[in-house]
Amino acid sequence: MLDSGMINKIQKAREYASEPERIHFRSLEVEFDGKNGEHHVDFREGHWHCDCDYFRGHHTCSHTMAMERVLGIMAPAEVA
């Protein structure tokens, strides 16, 4: 049985979820199971980072692009 406090929290969660512009990523860190092994992908200080060889030379890779697709509209935007 839900009490009134929990009902209010659920309603507040729905409100937040309907206004994604109120949510701001400061950091995000994941372990990505790639075809050639695991890769560490993170978003910090306004930029994506990956430990794969391709990212080192191009500042983007399939792992960071996949994270942007998975997160959809919630993907953090890189700063200039």
Predicted segments with their positions:
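Long, low-complexity, compositionally biased intrinsically disordered regions
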Residues: 1-80
